């Protein structure tokens, strides 16, 4: 079935990141439009992702057309900051700590979507400005064809076989790239120890990437052996990229670890189509859309009352078995993100 929810014009906008909305004022003057700025990962490579289905259903039910712009988590927040005096987006979807950053910068207004009471308190803002719409976890990917056995530790990645065959997205720009710092600081026991490791890893690192989603095709083709990612995005990508395998690094002698990295959505302050934005957020948290999170998107429902039992949900449960889930101090990370990224730049020379 053809999916036309993602408009070519909107998709092209992210390349230039202008200060005004795509298509000038035409979108803003059209009352049957809602504009979404989102971190990448929820749109399918072949039009078969969660966003593709959710936006199509929403358009059919409401007659409201979804204009969609995607990029790195930090990239989308930075764009919204530049447009703050003349907002172009109605809904912002990004990952921690960037959703907290957006809130701190006054980019989000309070709105409680229908069904938000079914979302865990840890997965939504206490002040009511954002909520998770898809739960997710940080992870790494490897090429299963070239590496019959996935690496298991951070230390293995320092081996010479990974020289120019390893890449992770840019901390401070990409949500999953920032997650590399968060997990390394947790696993190695602090900022200093993590930066010492990442300095060593730089010998094998191809270089920066603003988008995590663009790394998976390189891993699937064997251009890279290892990259960072997240469970939802990479599991969905593996349907069309058969060489992708998901794994979670451990310290040598330790357990593999990960942490929740939900796609969180909020209504933009001064949104040009506030009511349409509210309707879309309601739809994203509806029982139907939440049931589709695992069925179609390969992720985890944000609503606690949605118990997925489909094949994808069972496979995801097996994937997470034995992996220790820790909870980052998001307030600390949001407050000190610039400092952590600066330390990373100094350590790696990026």
Q: Can you say where each PLM-predicted feature lies in the sequence?
A:
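A ligand-binding cleft/hinge motif common to bilobed small-molecule-binding domains
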Residues: 97-103, 220, 225-245
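Short, low-complexity disordered leader/linker segments with a strong preference
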Residues: 1-35, 350
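Conserved N-terminal structural module of periplasmic/extracytoplasmic solute-binding proteins
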Residues: 8, 25-91
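A bilobed periplasmic-binding-protein/Venus flytrap-type ligand-binding module shared by bacterial periplasmic
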Residues: 139-146, 181-185, 260-274, 292-296
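Mature extracytoplasmic/periplasmic domains
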Residues: 268-324
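Periplasmic-binding protein-like
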Residues: 136, 198-201, 208, 242-269
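Extracytoplasmic ligand-binding site segments that recognize negatively charged/polar headgroups
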Residues: 37-51, 71-75, 87-223, 256
């Amino acid at each position: 079935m053809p999916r036309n929810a993602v408009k070519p014009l909107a998709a092209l906008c992210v390349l230039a990141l202008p200060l005004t909305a795509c298509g000038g004022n035409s979108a803003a003057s059209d009352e049957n439009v809602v504009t979404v700025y989102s971190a990448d990962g929820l749109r399918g490579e072949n039009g078969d992702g969660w966003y593709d289905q959710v936006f199509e259903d929403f358009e059919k039910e409401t007659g409201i057309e979804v204009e969609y712009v995607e990029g790195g988590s930090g990239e989308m927040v930075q764009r919204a900051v530049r447009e703050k005096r003349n907002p172009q987006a109605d809904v912002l979807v990004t990952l921690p700590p960037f959703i907290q950053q957006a809130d701190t910068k006054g980019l989000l207004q309070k709105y409680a979507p229908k069904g938000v009471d079914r979302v865990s308190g840890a997965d939504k803002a206490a002040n009511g400005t954002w909520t998770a719409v898809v739960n997710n976890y940080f992870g790494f990917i490897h090429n299963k064809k070239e590496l019959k056995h996935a690496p298991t530790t951070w230390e293995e990645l320092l081996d010479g076989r990974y020289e120019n065959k390893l890449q992770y997205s840019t901390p401070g720009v990409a949500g999953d790239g920032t997650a590399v710092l968060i997990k390394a600081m947790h696993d190695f026991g602090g900022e200093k120890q993590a930066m010492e490791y990442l300095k060593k890893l730089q010998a094998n690192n191809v270089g920066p990437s603003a988008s995590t989603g663009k790394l998976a095709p390189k891993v699937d083709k064997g251009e890279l052996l290892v990259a960072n990612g997240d469970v939802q995005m990479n599991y969905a990508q593996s349907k069309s990229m058969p060489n992708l395998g998901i794994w979670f690094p451990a310290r040598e002698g330790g357990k593999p670890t990960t942490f929740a990295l939900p796609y969180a959505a909020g209504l933009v302050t001064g949104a040009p189509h506030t009511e349409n934005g509210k309707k879309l957020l309601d739809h994203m948290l509806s029982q139907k859309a939440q049931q589709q999170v695992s069925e179609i998107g390969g992720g985890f429902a944000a609503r606690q009352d949605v118990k997925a039992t489909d094949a994808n949900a069972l496979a995801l449960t097996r994937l997470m078995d034995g992996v220790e889930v820790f909870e980052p101090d998001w307030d600390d990370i949001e407050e000190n993100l610039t400092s952590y990224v600066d330390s990373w730049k100094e350590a790696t020379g990026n």
